[in-house]
């Protein structure tokens, strides 16, 4: 378990405002995480290649099948606001 002072320091670095209850709870949780990391550090990983994902994942693509799309009028019919045949949205500054 890490101390409340350490939890408060990490929270300050992350710009998090924690209550006393949250500090106490986070101390236990962070301590458990650090214990898990220490167990991993103790493993003999000689010969184990580094990997970002332990599973051999590949993308599954569907066939590209052209089909009829929505007509402009149908798409604009459900828009809250339109202008000159286009969607009108609030400006983002």
Swiss-Prot record:
Keywords: ATP-binding, Ligase, Nucleotide-binding, Protein biosynthesis. GO terms for molecular function: asparaginyl-tRNA synthase (glutamine-hydrolyzing) activity; ATP binding; glutaminyl-tRNA synthase (glutamine-hydrolyzing) activity. InterPro entries: Asp/Glu-ADT_sf_sub_c, GatC. One of its GO terms (biological process) is glutaminyl-tRNAGln biosynthesis via transamidation. It comes from the Bacteria. It is an enzyme of class 6 (ligase). It catalyses: L-glutamyl-tRNA(Gln) + L-glutamine + ATP + H2O = L-glutaminyl-tRNA(Gln) + L-glutamate + ADP + phosphate + H(+); L-aspartyl-tRNA(Asn) + L-glutamine + ATP + H2O = L-asparaginyl-tRNA(Asn) + L-glutamate + ADP + phosphate + 2 H(+). Its EC number is 6.3.5.-. Allows the formation of correctly charged Asn-tRNA(Asn) or Gln-tRNA(Gln) through the transamidation of misacylated Asp-tRNA(Asn) or Glu-tRNA(Gln) in organisms which lack either or both of asparaginyl-tRNA or glutaminyl-tRNA synthetases. The reaction takes place in the presence of glutamine and ATP through an activated phospho-Asp-tRNA(Asn) or phospho-Glu-tRNA(Gln). Belongs to the GatC family. Heterotrimer of A, B and C subunits. This is Aspartyl/glutamyl-tRNA(Asn/Gln) amidotransferase subunit C. It comes from Rubrobacter xylanophilus (strain DSM 9941 / JCM 11954 / NBRC 16129 / PRD-1).
